[in-house]
Every structure is written in C-alpha cells, then in structure tokens.
A protein has these predicted regions:
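Structural motif corresponding to the early beta-alpha repeats
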Residues: 65, 84-108
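Structural motif
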Residues: 50, 54, 123-124, 157, ...
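Beta/alpha (TIM)-barrel catalytic core signal, keyed to glycine-rich beta->alpha loops juxtaposed to Asp/Glu
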Residues: 137, 141-330
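Active-site mouth loops of central-metabolism enzymes
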Residues: 32-42, 99-114, 137-141
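Active-site groove signature of glycoside hydrolases
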Residues: 121-141
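N-terminal binding-site loop/beta-alpha segment at the start of enzyme catalytic domains
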Residues: 1-89
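Short beta-strand segments at enzyme active-site cores
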Residues: 58-62, 91-93, 128-133, 163-164, ...
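Short, acidic/polar
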Residues: 39-51, 108-124, 172-176
C-alpha cells in the first residue's frame, strides 16, 4: 500500500460549492454539540479560534445543543464568540428537537419553527443564519406546512438556505419534490450520519443527493470518537459520548450504535491500514468520508482544541486508490447494517 499524498499546503482547507447553490464552504465544518457541557465556554472559544485560524470557517449548531437541561447553551456560546466576526463565518443551525416539555415546543410545525428561528437568532446574536435546517423529520406535521414555513423564513431574510437532517431517503425525495411542485425554496443540503462503521446512506440517500444537487454534510465521521483511536474494547469511558457526562440517554444511544465487539474488530484492522499509510486512525477516517465525491463537508466535533489537530489534517490528505479499495472492502458490511447487527 503506497503512502498518502497531500493536495494542499498544511493549514489550508479546500473549499467547494454547497451543492447546486452559489455558496462556497470549507470541506471541513466545526460541530458545536459539545459546547456548554463537554467543553465550557472558555474551551469552546479556544476550539472556535483554532478552527477559524485553520480555515474552518463553517460552523454547525442546533437549538437543542448540548441537549438535556442545557438546551440553547451551545448557540449562546457560539453567539458570544461571533461578535465582531459574523461576516467571517458560514453559520448553520438546526431546529425541530424538543426545546421544552410541550408537544408544540418541537417538530416541524409552523408555530414551532417560527418560534425556533427567532430563538436561535437571539442566542446567536445575529439577524440571519446562512443555513437553517430541520433537525429531524416530523411525521405528525404535514410536510407542506414545514416546507412552506422554511420558505417563509428565507423570504423574511432570517436564513439564506434551508436543509434537513436525519431524513430517510424516501422522505427526502418527497420533500424535494414538494418544494418543486409548490415553487418553494429548494432544499439545499442534507445532514446524515456517515462514517466507516455506518455506510447505509450510500445505498439510497447519497445517490439521491447527487441527483438532486443537494450538499451533503455528514455528522459523526468519527463514530462519536470511536474512530479516533482513543478507546479500547475494555474501556469504561468517564467522559465523551459513551459516558454519563453527556447524559445517560445520549450515552445509551451511542453505546447502542457503536460500542460492539464487531466495531472494535474492524477498528483493529483500520488502525493497521492507517499505520501503513503513516497517518492516524482519525485522519484516515475523516479523509475516507471526504473522499466520497457526494460529500460536501464533514462535521468535526471537539471537546478541546488539541482534538482538532488530527482531524484538521484530513483536509490535506489524499487517499491512494489502493487504500480506498482496502477500506471499502473491510467495511462493506456496514452498508447494510451497523456495528450492533
């Protein structure tokens, strides 16, 4: 297996068009879900400084981050950092998750989304976001109502583009079709889960995005840190996504998704490939996501600035063809199921 070659000078982040729009974004995006819980405000500001200095000027947040009792705190932290820097950042956020106990405080209804966008703008300290995304599909609200509301948010100047997250391919196809039929703002992007241990979106969602010109901005490229190489199968994590630090419900979710013998067996083989290429498992894993031509930008999370060092290197890494084949062969089964199956 040949060694890796870089296509850009160190510290430079490649840019690309945001799907079929005229927007240009870095191929790496900073996720902010850790802000306010795993990373306090001081550390979060250091993380944003590190990212921006490296050219990662695309930030993604959500009104429910960091989830639990602290909903909204991540946006507040981002908003305070943004003061005086707003025009330097492509800013995305999401709505639809539960912001309170009432049923109308979540979902894709007109009431909730109009309330949610105003709340996000207030916390972020800005009068618009570049990309406003529906965080989750809401089967209880008519899709036309949700799409018309997102269109109204763009028309009001509160967002430049709209996107969705966590959508199944058939629902995404229907949503895209309805925006065309109703002459509404088109869906510019989709934010799915995607990594070497979860490849199911390759079967339907990625081809759909390619056909319709949607940008693809995957989250979880390191499988909640499992593909960072910092965990072993015998660990009992006391911090991070697999621990109670993030709340038991979230920890249970990530443990169910990834913490399995099969996943660690795969990681052992992935680590060998990374070593042969002279790179880290984390860099290899993100570079693999970015090597998919349908992927626009990969979302990176961090709970301290040092964690970005490895992951930022992925922007400069061109995987050789034989490495791509080896990685594809090794993880082929994850196109049909995840590590729990």
């Amino acid at each position: 297996m040949t060694g890796c070659e870089t296509s850009h000078e160190e510290g430079n982040v490649q840019y690309t068009t945001f799907g079929a729009t005229g927007l240009t974004v870095p191929r790496l995006c900073l996720g902010t879900a850790t802000f306010g819980r795993q990373a306090d405000e001081t550390v979060a500001h250091q993380i944003m400084d590190t990212a921006a200095e490296a050219g990662v000027t695309f930030f993604d947040s959500a009104d429910i981050y960091p989830m639990g009792a602290e909903v909204g705190r991540s946006e507040e932290i981002v908003g305070r950092w943004l003061q005086g820097k707003r025009d330097q950042i492509i800013l995305a956020t999401k709505a639809g998750g539960p912001m309170g106990p009432a049923r109308w405080q979540q979902g894709g209804s007109r009431k909730h989304l109009l309330d949610a966008v105003d709340g996000s703008l207030r916390r972020l300290g800005t009068d618009y976001v570049d990309i406003y995304q529906l965080h989750f599909d809401d089967p209880d609200t008519p899709l036309d109502e949700t799409l018309a509301t997102l269109d109204a948010i763009v028309t009001a100047g509160k967002a430049r583009y709209i996107g969705v997250s966590n959508f199944l391919a058939y629902r995404l196809a229907r949503a895209a079709g309805r925006t065309e039929t109703l002459h509404l703002t088109r869906i510019a992007s989709v934010q799915p889960r995607y990594n070497l241990l979860f490849r199911q979106i390759e079967r339907e969602l990625l081809p759909l995005a390619a056909e319709t010109g949607m940008a693809v901005i995957p989250f979880n490229p390191l499988a909640a840190g499992l593909l960072s190489g910092k965990y072993t199968r015998d660990d009992q994590p006391t911090e991070g996504r697999f621990s109670a630090q993030v709340g038991q419900r979230i920890a249970d979710l990530y443990n169910e998704r990834y913490w399995h013998t099969k996943a660690f067996d795969t990681i052992d083989q992935l680590t060998k490939i990374a070593s042969e290429l002279g790179t880290s498992l984390a860099t290899l894993s993100i570079a693999w996501v970015l090597a998919n031509p349908t992927v626009t930008s990969a979302i990176l999370g961090a709970s301290r600035p040092a964690q970005l060092t490895d992951t930022l290197a992925a922007a400069d890494l061109d995987l050789p063809d034989d490495a791509k084949v080896a990685l594809d062969d090794l993880t082929q089964e994850y196109r049909w199921g995840d590590a729990a199956r």
